[in-house]
């Protein structure tokens, strides 16, 4: 079979195959040997699949079903992540930042705890508090800032029990924070500076998306 979660030119790798995993680990370690300090690990929750191949009800205009129906709630991904950590990251004391969305509070220590899979993961919960519908890229703007603020405070309290997260306001999948939170008539140096101050004053590791450092809008 041929499976692609993203572009059709970008096949998913079969992590159930030990030989495939070994090749992945070889490549990671090769880059670490070149002097890299760590990795941002993209879409990592997609590596484990439901391979029962049950028929899925189409949920899109193209007659296909969302791929997350076979990747969203699959047990056993932790075995792969811990193996990769022990084989590739621990020996180099590497910094690892996982793109792991919708990690529930009860399993958060497995991801960022003292013996977690990663050094940290991105703090997506506040960013998804204001999304519209099931599509994580579907937003209305400008958004009431207090909703994001309250969700951020709540998330900070939860995360502090387990470790720390990589804090973001925007990325390549989401609107610019300046456009999302700041009404057009209030757009300027002081409002943009206030938005930037927040991410640097949160507990955790601040991440800036390209253009955010100059207050870029959509």
List the predicted regions and their residue ranges:
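Active-site and adjacent substrate-binding regions of carbohydrate-active enzymes
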Residues: 1-218
């Amino acid at each position: 079979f041929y499976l692609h979660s993203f572009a059709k030119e970008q096949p998913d790798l079969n992590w159930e195959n030990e030989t495939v995993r070994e090749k992945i680990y070889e490549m990671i370690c090769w880059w670490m040997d070149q002097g890299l300090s760590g990795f941002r690990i993209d879409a990592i929750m997609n590596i484990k699949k439901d391979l029962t191949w049950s028929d899925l009800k189409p949920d899109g205009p193209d007659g296909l079903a969302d791929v997350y129906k076979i990747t969203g709630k699959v047990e056993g991904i932790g075995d792969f992540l811990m193996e990769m950590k022990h084989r590739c990251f621990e020996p180099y004391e590497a910094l690892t930042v996982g793109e792991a969305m919708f990690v529930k509070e009860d399993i958060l220590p497995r991801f960022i705890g003292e013996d977690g899979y990663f050094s940290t993961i991105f703090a997506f919960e506040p960013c998804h508090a204001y999304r519209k519908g099931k599509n994580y890229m579907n937003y209305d703007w400008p958004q009431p800032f207090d909703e994001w603020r309250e969700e951020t405070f709540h998330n900070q309290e939860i995360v502090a029990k387990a470790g720390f997260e990589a804090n973001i306001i925007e990325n390549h999948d989401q609107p610019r924070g300046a456009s999302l939170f700041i009404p057009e008539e209030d757009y300027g140096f002081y409002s943009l500076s206030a938005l930037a101050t927040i991410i640097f004053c949160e507990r955790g590791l601040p991440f800036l998306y390209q253009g955010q450092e100059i207050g870029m809008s959509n």
